[in-house]
């Protein structure tokens, strides 16, 4: 058994038309998996799938656009994946949203509801759609991309952090429930990564210096540096790991 071999495995990655999700999809395909690219907009999904097929061979990737806020669209994502590839071995819940920045007292019910819906409830929906076949097969890896925000307080993105902490607890609970059936559930908690999602932080040189100086590695992360963690959690290399949160943050959470 090769530790990081994903040959014959099928992976669904949400939010995979760009950023961390795209990097994860590319690296899973590189290690042998067939991958499903999914985000809201069809065009970018098609582009990523086409690039993966051009690099690794036709049929290695398909695009199935879906809005994570829609239970019906998530079910279609699962159904079309099974129709194309016959099964789902790996699920990466990466898509998330944050429509509000500011103190908790200022967030509207609609904004808070959207954050919890898209970042927690939608993950729950999709996981429950995919899990029955994994439990029956007694094999599967589910990965939730959380954030170090789920480990810390923050005066500007408190609601987002609440949702990311909930993702970690979701993984822990499901790991306990499904461990006897050899279905593993883990989280990745990235620090600041150079994606469009965090563009407001790294576009400003002064702000970037402010947020990276406390980190031992003194720099921002790249999407591909999160992808390595996903390959590990998806592969046989992590077969004895479940219910955990793998922190990939340049050391910021351990620095004084």
Locate the predicted segments by residue.
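Substrate-binding pocket helix/loop in short-chain dehydrogenase/reductase
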Residues: 102-104, 108-116, 211
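Active-site loop-to-helix junction immediately N-terminal to the catalytic Tyr of the SDR YXXXK motif
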Residues: 107, 153-161, 173
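Residue(s) in the substrate-gating loop at a strand-loop-helix junction
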Residues: 147
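Alpha-helical segment proximal to the catalytic Tyr-Lys
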Residues: 132, 176-180, 239
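Short C-terminal tail/terminal secondary-structure segment
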Residues: 1-2, 98-101, 152, 231, ...
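Conserved glycine-rich cofactor-binding loop
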Residues: 10, 17-19
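Active-site helix of classical SDR
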Residues: 127, 163, 171
């Amino acid at each position: 058994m090769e530790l990081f071999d994903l040959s014959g495995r099928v992976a669904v990655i949400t939010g995979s038309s760009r950023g961390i999700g795209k990097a994860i999809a590319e690296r899973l395909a590189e290690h042998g998996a067939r991958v499903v690219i999914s985000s809201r907009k069809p065009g970018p999904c098609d582009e990523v799938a086409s690039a993966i097929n051009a690099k690794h061979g036709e049929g290695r990737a398909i695009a199935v656009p879906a809005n994570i806020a829609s239970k019906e669209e998530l079910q279609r994502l699962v159904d079309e994946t099974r129709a194309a590839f016959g099964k789902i071995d790996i699920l990466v819940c990466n898509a998330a949203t944050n429509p509000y920045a500011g103190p908790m007292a200022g967030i509207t019910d609609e904004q808070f509801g959207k954050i919890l819906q898209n970042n927690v409830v939608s993950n729950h929906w999709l996981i429950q759609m995919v899990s029955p076949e994994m439990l029956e097969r007694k094999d599967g890896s589910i990965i939730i991309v959380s954030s170090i925000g789920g480990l810390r307080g923050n005066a500007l993105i408190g609601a987002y952090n609440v949702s990311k902490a909930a993702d970690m607890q979701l993984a822990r609970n499901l790991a306990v429930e499904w461990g006897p059936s050899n279905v593993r559930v883990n989280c990745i908690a990235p620090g600041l990564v150079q994606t469009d999602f965090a563009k407001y932080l790294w576009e400003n040189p002064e702000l970037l210096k402010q947020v990276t100086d406390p980190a031992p590695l003194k720099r921002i992360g790249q999407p591909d540096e999160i992808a390595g963690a996903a390959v590990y959690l998806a592969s046989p290399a992590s077969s004895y790991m479940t219910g955990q949160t793998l922190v990939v943050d340049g050391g910021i959470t351990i620095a004084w």
